[in-house]
Amino acid sequence: MDRAVLLLSVLSLGVSSQPITEGQRLFSIAVERVHNLHLLAQRLFTEFESSLQTEEQRQLNKIFLQDFCNSDYIISPIDKHETQRSSVLKLLSISYRLIESWEFPSRSLSVGPAARNQISPKLSELKTGILLLIGANQDGAEMFPDSSTLQLAPYGNYYQSLGADESLRRTYELLACFKKDMHKVETYLTVAKCRLSPEANCTL
C-alpha cells in the first residue's frame, strides 16, 4: 500500500511539473482578461436594466431582439458546433475584430467614469494579447483572409445629441451588445485555448 501511494505521488509530481508553454501562458492571460470584461459587461447591463421601469425593460428588450449589434457584420460561427470546428487562427481573428470594434464605442458607454476608464485599457490590453497569439499561430497564413478591409459603421448615432427616449435605447443597445460580444470572445478564446491540450474535452 505504501509503495502504491509513493508511486502515485511521484506520478502526480511528474504531471504537475510539466512546463507551461508561452502560448499556454498567453492564452490563460487572455481568457482571464476577457472573463473579467464579460463580468464587467454583465454587471453594467444588469445595473442599467434594474434602473428602468418594468414597461421600459419590456419595450427595450423587444426592440433589441429585432435589432442587430454593429459587430454582427463580423462573420463568426453561427452555433457551438461551428465554433468547435473552427480553427484556432479563425477564432483568434474573430476575437481580435470583435475587441477592436469596441475600442471607440466603449468610450461612449453611459456608465460611471470609473467603470468607463477601466474598459478602454482592458480592451487595449486584450487586443494586444490576442495579436500576439495570432502571430504565434499564424504559420504563414494571412491574418484576416476574409474581408480584410471590413469597415464597421458606427453604433447607431451615439456621437449625436439624442432625445431622452433615443438616448435610453442607445444605452440599452450598447450595453446589451457589449455583453453579448464579450461572451462571444470569451467562448472563442476558451475553445482556442482548450485546443492546446490534446486530451482535453473542448465540448461547449
From Swiss-Prot:
What's a single GO CC term here? Answer: extracellular space
Sites of Pyrrolidone carboxylic acid modification: Q18
Q: Which GO terms describe its molecular function?
A: growth hormone activity; growth hormone receptor binding; metal ion binding
Q: List the disulfide bonds.
A: C69-C177, C194-C202
Q: Which InterPro entries match?
A: 4_helix_cytokine-like_core (IPR009079), Somatotropin (IPR034975), Somatotropin/Prolactin (IPR001400), Somatotropin_CS (IPR018116)
Q: What is this protein called?
A: Somatotropin
The cross-references to Pfam families, in alphabetical order and at most eight, read: Hormone_1 (PF00103)
- Tell me the leader sequence span: 1-17
Q: Which gene encodes it?
A: gh
